[in-house]
């Protein structure tokens, strides 16, 4: 399985969409616990609409998002706390179900995991893939 990841932290909607199209991504899998954003266009519904305009499917898998205490740890630079908290999140039954959905969706069509952080090293999307798709070929997109 090949899967892309992308963050929208330092980009415009145009650059974001162009990066996805250039990579051949056909589906965005939003793994934010709270799919709202202060960045224009990146909240769930506007994002879904913008993606649809360029022929990219949108799926939100909320249970794969980082819980509030994990987001606080990430903002404070407490990577070990983030890793511990997120590992607990992935042990929840709904996260297990959505992890399987993520793998199925990614196997079906070229897909990109979406979160805020530009750098995947500081984002839970890297933790998710390491835990739930360790053999996947991963390409990080940087719009």
Roles of regions detected by a PLM:
Residues 1-143:
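Residues lining hydrophobic/aromatic ligand-binding pockets adjacent to catalytic sites
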């Amino acid at each position: 399985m090949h899967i892309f990841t992308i963050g929208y932290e330092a980009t415009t909607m145009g650059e974001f969409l162009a990066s996805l199209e250039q990579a051949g991504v056909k589906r965005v899998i939003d793994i934010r616990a709270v799919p709202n954003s202060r960045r224009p266009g990146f909240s769930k519904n506007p994002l879904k609409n913008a993606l649809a305009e360029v022929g990219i499917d949108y799926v939100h898998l909320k249970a794969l998002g980082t819980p509030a205490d994990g987001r606080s740890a990430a903002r404070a630079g407490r990577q070990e706390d983030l890793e511990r908290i997120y590992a607990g999140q992935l042990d929840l039954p709904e996260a297990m179900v959505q992890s399987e959905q993520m793998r199925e969706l990614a196997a079906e069509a070229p897909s990109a995991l979406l979160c805020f952080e530009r750098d995947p090293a500081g984002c839970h999307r890297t933790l998710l893939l390491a835990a739930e798709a360790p053999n996947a070929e991963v390409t990080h997109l940087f719009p």
